[in-house]
């Protein structure tokens, strides 16, 4: 058995296969997933699992050099970053939700959560560990 927090085999495999600059998306239950990236559907019920929980597990294994969130997520939170963004190792950059959705096409994997908060999505860009 693995010793790290992330137990989901497909998600762990996707992270292990990342190269520098590759992207993984953690999305809410409503984020459209394009046909190209690996789809990892973790949604069980509304709210389960939450983006914050999946993000914590992913960050236990992934070196992140850049993160992206939709401007609409910040606007919806009254001008502040969503609470789960505090777990990110870097300050996220913002872009429109439409541009966010376009970038998901280039992601290596899109992880669907049960999160039902609008715009609760983040793109994680892989860094290097050396």
From Swiss-Prot:
Protein's UniProt keywords contain Secreted: no
Lineage top rank: taxon: Bacteria
Cellular component terms (Gene Ontology): cytosol
Pathway: Carbohydrate metabolism; D-ribose degradation; D-ribose 5-phosphate from beta-D-ribopyranose: step 1/2
UniProt keyword annotation of Chloroplast present: no
Pfam family, one: RbsD_FucU
Biological processes per GO annotation: D-ribose catabolic process
Family: Belongs to the RbsD / FucU family. RbsD subfamily.
Self-association and partners: Homodecamer.
Protein name (database record): D-ribose pyranase
Species of origin: Paracidovorax citrulli (strain AAC00-1) (Acidovorax citrulli)
